[in-house]
Design a protein with these regions (language model features):
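The feature encodes the CheY-like receiver
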Residues: 57, 66, 75, 87
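Alpha4 helix (beta4-alpha4-beta5 surface) of REC/receiver domains from two-component response regulators
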Residues: 16-19, 63, 86-107, 111-115, ...
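Two-component/phosphorelay signaling modules centered on CheY-like receiver
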Residues: 12-30
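As written
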Residues: 25, 47, 61, 70, ...
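Active-site beta3 strand of CheY-like receiver
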Residues: 45-51, 56
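Acidic catalytic/metal-coordinating carboxylates
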Residues: 34-37, 60-66
Length: 124
């Protein structure tokens, strides 16, 4: 069975682009449009990986990541945070929240993703 990914992204355009990349490397993807929906989905059906946008309505990606990392169901699920920002401050906040990796959206590509997924043990 293909590894499962929960993508938490509020932009439908971005979600489609990212989903296409993830599916192109053989992953099964479900999409949540905001933080509360993403948390609910992750707790009900823990995925193999969570790809999480930082800028979300109602609660930001850092808050979502912290909640997921505190829950028994998802504490060991790798989280890759996505953002338009590339500053050190944002990276440190994301890692402190529990993210396993941090990828700027402008370099989100299949090759980089494959490398990260192998490092996290999601793909062989």
């Amino acid at each position: 069975m293909a590894p499962t990914v929960l993508l938490i992204e509020d932009s439908q355009t971005q979600a489609k682009q990212i989903r296409d990349v993830l599916e192109s490397v053989g992953l099964t993807v479900s999409v949540a449009n905001d933080g509360p929906e993403g948390i609910r989905e992750a707790l009900e059906n823990p995925p193999d990986l969570i790809v999480l946008d930082i800028k979300l309505p109602s609660m930001d990606g850092y808050q979502v990541c912290r909640r997921l990392k505190r829950a028994d169901e998802t504490k060991d699920v790798p989280v890759i945070m996505l953002t338009d920002k590339t500053g050190t401050k944002e990276t440190m906040i994301g890692l402190k929240a529990g993210a396993d990796d941090y990828i700027p959206k402008d370099i989100f590509a299949a090759e980089h993703l494959m490398e990260t997924l192998r490092e996290l043990g999601v793909l062989d």
